[in-house]
From Swiss-Prot:
Pathway: Cofactor biosynthesis; (R)-pantothenate biosynthesis; (R)-pantoate from 3-methyl-2-oxobutanoate: step 1/2
Entry similarity comment: Belongs to the PanB family.
EC numbers, comma separated: 2.1.2.11
Residues at which Mg(2+) binds: D49, D88, E120
Stated name of the protein: 3-methyl-2-oxobutanoate hydroxymethyltransferase
GO MF term set: 3-methyl-2-oxobutanoate hydroxymethyltransferase activity; magnesium ion binding
Gene name, Swiss-Prot/TrEMBL: panB
Species name: Paramagnetospirillum magneticum (strain ATCC 700264 / AMB-1)
CDD domains: KPHMT-like
GO cellular component: cytoplasm
Amino acid sequence: MSTEVRIKRITTRDIRARKGAEPLVVLTAYTAPIARLLDPICDILLVGDSLGMVVYGMETTLAVTLEMMINHGAAVVRSSSRACVVVDMPFGSYQESKEQAFRNCARVMAETGCAAVKLEGGRELAETIRFLTDRGIPVMAHIGLKPQAVHAAGGFRAQGRIESEAEAIRADARAITEAGAFSVVVEGTVEPVAQALSAEIAIPTIGIGASAACDGQVLVIDDLVGLFDDFTPKFVKRYADLRPIITKAAEDYAAEVKARTFPGPEHCFGVAKK
């Protein structure tokens, strides 16, 4: 008889039940090695469309394709066994109609095996979120600063500084909650607003540049370990700097190759003795 203990994967229902409890730990993951490292630590692994910038070198997330998200999402699901895996829906894949959103979200879930999808938007997406959740697709919403709408918003800036803007964000939070989202990312939103809506709505809020009062926090893993330094948002805390470590390893390798000291005998195959 096998004594192997099967690890239970965290579900969207588990995430929703964490409202007001121990804060949720969320990080992005795009590749198999990172997913394996983060899986025991994180409640949610978010396959973010930020991969367009940190993996593919794009200037924004707007050119990320559905195929990219599916490929990376599948790798993260295959390489994790505990965390709830959520995949971002890229720009243009869900805004046209409820039917388009369902078709593409269903494809992402079927081809990746993820637990849920994430959509950016508030009141304008409430009908779509309801359409999806009624048909068995769990949705994580995303309000406040929405990177996919950065051009329409006039660039990256903190949201909610004026009362009309703050009330719009609170209205978005109420709308996506009523539509059936199981959680919501609150990005780049002034702390009093993020704190107030976290207390008001019944689903977990996951902050990024919002407030410690949110029900969880998310960061981009490449920001956290210093691998992405094209720019560093105010809300990023760098917990490690791997760039000099990787650079030093590559420099040492290059020096040994040029000196013909690598590969050494221990790294080569010899002829079998007769």
